Amino acid sequence: MSAALCSILAAAAYAQVGPPVPSEGDPPVGGGESGAPAQEGEGSSEGSKVNAELTLFGLHIFSSGFDGAAGDVSVTRIGEQLRVSVPRGDRSAFLLGFDAMHSWYEFDGATGFVTSGEPWENATELDFSAGYRGAIGDHWGFVVGANVNAAFETGGDFGDSLTFGGRAGFTYSSSDTLTLGLGVAVSSRLEDDVLAVPFPVLSWQVSDRWLVASYGDSRGTGLGVSYMPNDAWTFTLRAGLGAHEFRLDETGPVPDGVGRTWHVPVEFIAAWKIDPQVTLQAGVGYEAWQQYTLDDSEGNELAEFDADPALVVGIGVEFTF
């Protein structure tokens, strides 16, 4: 799964259609590292009002060693996620999204990748998505959309960092509290084959206080359970799968190569709505599995190592407009 495909899944999760589903009000904290389930839908009570959500986040993945190789790695990320919904009636809307994230990778003695021990230093990931969700009768809905993603290390060629994707899916809402769906996301990759992945959509308001929902943000997708003891607080436990891939520096140890990472985060998040338009978030998590891959400019694998599990902490703030 590429970063671009993660972005498509994020847009698909955001674009859930059907009868209004109560929202827990907690967007992701850390672009797939630490956060609450993404908001699954927009209610119809806002009429024709344009809805926007802006999330700013930061996180740190603590140092972990490589399995069967020398060295260790830690990661620090900062970024933003912007989601805009332009309603077209009660259950239809145009959807726009823009995500930006910068990551610093601190490799120490990782000589299994390159002799210098530092296969790459940083990565910037940018993603723009556009889509449309609509209704078919009282219970069925659909979503279609596309995105373009640029991901590159400082000094990497921007044109060679672009990937493109699209998605399509259907949802069925049996009631105001339960929506199920299935779709397909397709994405090009950097020096690799096109990838197509089916994705589920689930939003189940078990009670006034409990929500089970699939989530998607720009770097991953998964399933979360949220508890809302009151209107101000939300506590979420979630697990998922995330990925990143990016074009490397033209003058680096592997010129124009590709760096890839996969991870399986398990996270606990607390979100505090201090104002109807402002929510503070803090999360702690565990990278249960991590994998780092280094490819050359033609996509040939040079090295691939799993990393040990690692602690993750993240903070964020969401503004709604």
Regions of interest found by a model, annotated:
Residues 198-207, 268-273, 278, 305-321:
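Outer-membrane beta-barrel "beta-signal"
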Residues 59-68, 101-112, 135, 147-157, ...:
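Sequence/structural signature of outer-membrane beta-barrel proteins
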